[in-house]
Amino acid sequence: MRLEAKDIYAGYGKIEVLHGATLRAAEGEIICIIGPNGSGKSTLLKTVFGLLKPTKGTVSFDGKDITRLEPEQKVRLGIAFIPQGRNVFPSLTVRENLEMGGTVLDDEKAVQHAIEEALESYPLLKRKIRDKAGNLSGGEKQILSLARADMVKPSLILMDEPSIGLSPRMIDEVYLKIAEINRRGTTFAIVEQNARKALSMAHRGYVLDLGRTRLEDTGAGLLDNEEVKKLYLGG
């Protein structure tokens, strides 16, 4: 199993948000995590990445216990995290943002090679290579966040609300890129309020509620689930 989070309890100070949440993702899978606001979805991703330390439970990656590792250690293992909110450096150019994504590469030559590969894969960014990231649209910033995370070809990408605030056209573009990267074998764990979009391409999905994993099924299975339809798919 590429990623497995078991019986996770975590939160912020004395406020516990997760109460035994569990998820798993096999190599090459796209999994999505849906649920109401405040259910602990983002907290779960932050705990997997190491931004929060669980009070109970374990996180394993390719069979290795990584529960207590720091985020920078997890990056070197091949895990990338794209938080909610267009995680770019607004005062830096598109190229400079991509360079920041290559900091774990061995040398400058490797970084520049990765940038050239990224620009071939993301033509939208190639056209704006000298623009400040802060001047990009919301969708362009999300594409830049994804391209920067993809610079080191991680084996697992964690994404928090990739479609929030985007136009339907840009949502489609972001998810097309996710599908393209996934075809290389990269695993994705995606927290998403746009449940229909995420479940339609997910191999498996999870419903989180009140800090617990309430449902697990294939993406198609959750799309057909009457309770999920009523609560998260508009009927």
PLM regions and their residue ranges:
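ABC-type ATPase nucleotide-binding domains, specifically the catalytic core motifs of the NBD
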Residues: 13, 69, 94-113, 121-123, ...
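The feature captures the beta-strand-to-loop junction immediately N-terminal to the Walker
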Residues: 34-36
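Helix-to-loop junction immediately C-terminal to a conserved catalytic motif
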Residues: 49
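Conserved ABC transporter NBD signature motif
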Residues: 57-64, 77, 110-115, 217
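Conserved ABC ATPase signature
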Residues: 132-136
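ABC ATPase C-loop
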Residues: 149-150
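Catalytic Walker B motif of ABC-type/P-loop ATPase nucleotide-binding domains
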Residues: 157-161
